[in-house]
Amino acid sequence: MAKVRLNLLNIFQLRINQKSIDYNGKTVGDIISQFLSEYRDKLDDELFDVKKKEFNAQILILLNGRNIKYLKNYKTNLKDGDELYLSYALAGG
C-alpha cells in the first residue's frame, strides 16, 4: 500500500473544510473510495452521481498533475508520495 496525499481544491476544499487528507491505498479507486466513505454526505448530487457511483463529468482527478482519464483511470496504481488532486473543472473567459 502506498501513502498518498489527496489535495482538495475549490468546491471540495470548501465543503470538507480541509486542504488535504492523507490515505493509504493501492489504486486511485482505493483512495477515492475511502474519501467518499468519510465525506459523501458533504457532497452535492451535482458532484457525485449516486446511480453510477462515480463523480460527474466536470470533476477532475489528477495524479501528480496528470488526468487519471489518460492513465488507467480509477485502476491507476499508486506509489508512496504520490499526490492526487480533486477539483471541479472551472472555465472562464
Q: Language-model features: where?
A:
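Ubiquitin-like/PB1-type beta-grasp interaction modules and other compact soluble beta-rich domains
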Residues: M1-G92
